């Protein structure tokens, strides 16, 4: 493996944050400098955490996942007040979801090692599975290439109610068939059988979406010491009761802080992402097997426009008796994470960094400082045949990441003829319009009744010129089919659906091509935290 770093222009909050823009930096509590991390460590030492209770739960959960000895040792180390975490999270996508989930885990593992070395204290990697998320449609699919087209393969396991991913049961039989269909689109290799067996073993040990996800991640990162936490685990909820009570009792302060911070973000020229009602409580409650967002109305806490209603006392009693019925929303999830874990750094994707910029004052409501927010590593894989295609087309390795491939393709095709096709036809259309405009004026002077027909005549001539242009382009494309197929392969491999590779493709393709140790080898590479895009040549 060889890594090439490419500077890819980023827009909005994350782009300015990486460039250390002074304005957006004020929306975060720590600079990403050695001094910033040391200050964070100092601040954490003045905080109290329920370490022993957390360790007991994490040991039980990770042992169920058959985590390796390095993970168990890291969990046990958390009982020590001088142990801290690098943390990040994601939804429980089927087959681990898009590549960026794996890349986020790699980022967490890498940064934990680096911070342990630079800060001189124990730092362990933690991945937070967003098990409370109830939008199964966001995690129930993957993309493949089939019949030379990109196809979305959906696992049809419909849930009519808004059940969390931690509680959404998964049919092993149906999911096995779905996985078989996915692997039929991959070339059979020396690794295919082992990879399928690896996935099947994880599936057969699972009963829910989160189970399946957690077992795959545990296996893929077996020797890294990675600790997993399911944010919707009933035993974890028991540790969260006291903080849920604080959220409920201070919801007005939370909403005011969110509003004030969003005003600052607006003043800096950014559009806020988080949308909430003024009476939002920022807590979900499970009612009749459905996840219901709570709101305040006339002194009551209501759900579904008043269908469900609770007094403050009733809600607190319900929390104490059944904490597993409660979960966080986008505003309070980071707060709960901060309450539970002594976090030396949070790893976030572009979207997360944008919405975290809106939460600074919300953290301060609870006397928390927002942890250092570190952009996750971004990675693309470039296979040998793709590198060959690039060179054949006289493109630079960075071109697919910084330029529009469709425009590069059109430019290449135009260069295959002596004169630019589009310019020639544009010129012809303009000349024709000038001639026809003069002709229409002449016709109109002699017979005004033909004015409408003359207009139609012009449009038909225009259509015929456009038809001729299309036919010429089609013939050119057929003539240069071999080269244009190379552009298509580049597009599918590196910019599928016009998006970054890591937002579309799944890790299973690469496991099938390069073996079960593929993720381990990628994790062991050296990366820069300077905002560049890492292209790994395979």
Curated annotation (Swiss-Prot):
Annotated coiled-coil segments of the chain: 421-485
This protein's UniProt keywords: Coiled coil, Ligase
Domain of life: Bacteria
Enzyme class: ligase
Record's keyword annotation contains Oxidoreductase: no
EC number from the UniProt entry: 6.-.-.-
MF annotations from Gene Ontology: ligase activity
Tagged with keyword DNA-binding: no
Task performed by this protein: Involved in bacillithiol (BSH) biosynthesis. May catalyze the last step of the pathway, the addition of cysteine to glucosamine malate (GlcN-Mal) to generate BSH.
Family the entry assigns: Belongs to the BshC family.
NCBIfam families attached to this UniProt entry: thiol_BshC
The protein, known as: Putative cysteine ligase BshC
UniProt organism field: Bacillus cytotoxicus (strain DSM 22905 / CIP 110041 / 391-98 / NVH 391-98)
Gene: bshC
